[in-house]
Amino acid sequence: MANKRTPIFIAGILIPILLNGCSSGKNKAYLDPKVFPPQVEGGPTVPSPDEPGLPLPGPGPALPTNGAIPIPEPGTAPAVSLMNMDGSVLTMWSRGAGSSLWAYYIGDSNSFGELRNWQIMPGTRPNTIQFRNVDVGTCMTSFPGFKGGVQLSTAPCKFGPERFDFQPMATRNGNYQLKSLSTGLCIRANFLGRTPSSPYATTLTMERCPSSGEKNFEFMWSISEPLRPALATIAKPEIRPFPPQPIEPDEHSTGGEQ
């Protein structure tokens, strides 16, 4: 009995060893080309130094600060919105001429409508433009205020056309400083040091235009698309029930006409 069990015992040991050896050899020989990084015994291969790398994110090429200003052609008068770096837009809060201008956040000024949009008009001097409010039709200007300082406001465009000239000065990030030639000052949105006096608007002041190297974050304005209601491109279908069908009289009915 012992002699008969010995071959069976030896075979039971050798068969798993042989099967394991065959499978291991097959795994080492077969490299799946769809697997990345490439399969090697020592792990993933090191990238070649000649392999081109991905470009690192960063600022693009600097824009010239004295670049040409896009002046609209006479008669075009494109409508735009003027947005500062705080995300609020330059807005007329009152339709009366002479009222101060503020910068309101878009979500808080939806009811203002076209009071937030401005038409760009050619100025009376080279490289200057004028801003005419789309809703009211008065033009933006600056003048000494009643309580001191200089006020940013609007007035009828026919009163001294040269007083409405603004000079857009391009910055390196594609925005503009807006300099009023009537006072020689630039529009500043005081959102970094804002007070709780108005939680929905940013105070606008006219101050000396920053020179090269000075902080100008609050002086930068983006000349963007006008703010208008968005319309759906696809109308939602209106589902209505079918009208009731007429009931035909039953030929076996005893009541009513046949």
Swiss-Prot record:
Keyword hit for Ubl conjugation: no
Lipidation (N-palmitoyl cysteine): 22
Keywords assigned: Cell outer membrane, Lectin, Lipoprotein, Membrane, Palmitate, Signal, Toxin, Virulence
Coiled coil (residue ranges): none
Bias type Pro residues, positions: 46-62
UniProt topology in membrane: Lipid-anchor
Positions of region (Mediates binding to target cells): 93-104
InterPro entries: CDtoxinA, CDtoxinA/C, Ricin_B-like_lectins
Chain residue ranges for the region called Disordered: 40-71, 236-258
CDD domains in UniProt: beta-trefoil_Ricin_CdtA (cd23414)
Signal peptide: 1-21
Subcellular location per the Swiss-Prot or TrEMBL entry: Cell outer membrane
Residues with lipidation of kind S-diacylglycerol cysteine: 22
Entry annotated with the keyword Transmembrane: no
GO CC annotations, alphabetized: cell outer membrane
Domain Ricin B-type lectin: 125-223
Basic and acidic residues composition-biased segments: 249-258
GO molecular function, one term: toxin activity
Further comment: The operon of the strain O128:H- / 9142-88 / EPEC is referred to as cdt type II (CDT-II).
Assembly, per entry: Heterotrimer of 3 subunits, CdtA, CdtB and CdtC.
Protein function: CDTs are cytotoxins which induce host cell distension, growth arrest in G2/M phase, nucleus swelling, and chromatin fragmentation in HeLa cells. CdtA, along with CdtC, probably forms a heterodimeric subunit required for the delivery of CdtB.
Record protein name field: Cytolethal distending toxin subunit A
Taxonomic source organism: Escherichia coli
Gene: cdtA
